[in-house]
Design a protein with these regions (language model features):
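Walker B catalytic acidic pair
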Residues: 125
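Active-site-proximal or metal-binding-adjacent scaffold patches in catalytic folds
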Residues: 1-120, 129-175
Length: 175
């Protein structure tokens, strides 16, 4: 049961969202690796912005604080006024958001990889934080729309277009 006493809806889009995000991260990784930032998205040539990477929990915390302090974020989502604490997470499987304590947990470096210390992952977790009620599906249409709005306003419209098109190709619904 959720904090407000309601049952959260079934998370039927979770696998589709994660599949789409993995594809998007791959596009950003290749753009960074090879220096070719222009990609074709369903016939449109788009130059991807640079995705920020983080070195530590402290740098993620600073970024989260700055995103939540943006005027347009505070104006759009009441929960932007609720501070988020960032902590390291054991293991390397996933980042996650803990609703009850407003905690964003990110796995740090595992070997040579720090896959979760990146802007797209942090914005995904912030989209969970900004949910107005605990009754919505964790990766449902409302979440996906909120995530894309964050990406659009923080990283840029080109990144948001890539996510929207990729999610659409994976069968993700928006609301």
């Amino acid at each position: 049961m959720s904090d407000d006493g309601r049952q959260p809806r079934r998370d039927s889009q979770r696998a589709k969202v994660y599949d789409g995000e993995q594809l998007v991260r791959g596009v950003f990784d290749r753009a960074a690796e090879f220096g070719h930032r222009t990609v074709d998205i369903y016939g449109s040539q788009v130059t991807l912005p640079v995705e920020r990477r983080f070195a530590s929990v402290e740098s993620v915390q600073s970024y989260v604080d700055k995103v939540l302090a943006l005027n347009w974020v505070r104006g759009q989502w009441a929960r932007a006024g609720v501070p988020v604490r960032v902590r390291a997470r054991a293991g390397s499987s996933a980042a996650h958001y803990e609703v009850a304590e407003a905690v964003l947990a990110v796995p740090l470096h595992t070997g040579v990889s720090a896959w979760a210390l990146r802007e797209l992952v942090v914005l995904h977790e912030l989209a969970h934080h900004l949910a107005p009620t605990a009754g919505e599906a964790p990766h449902g249409p409302e979440f996906c729309t909120r995530y894309i709005e964050l990406v659009d306003g923080v990283i840029g419209p080109e990144a948001a277009l890539l996510i929207r098109a990729t999610f659409g190709g994976c069968g993700v619904r928006f609301g």
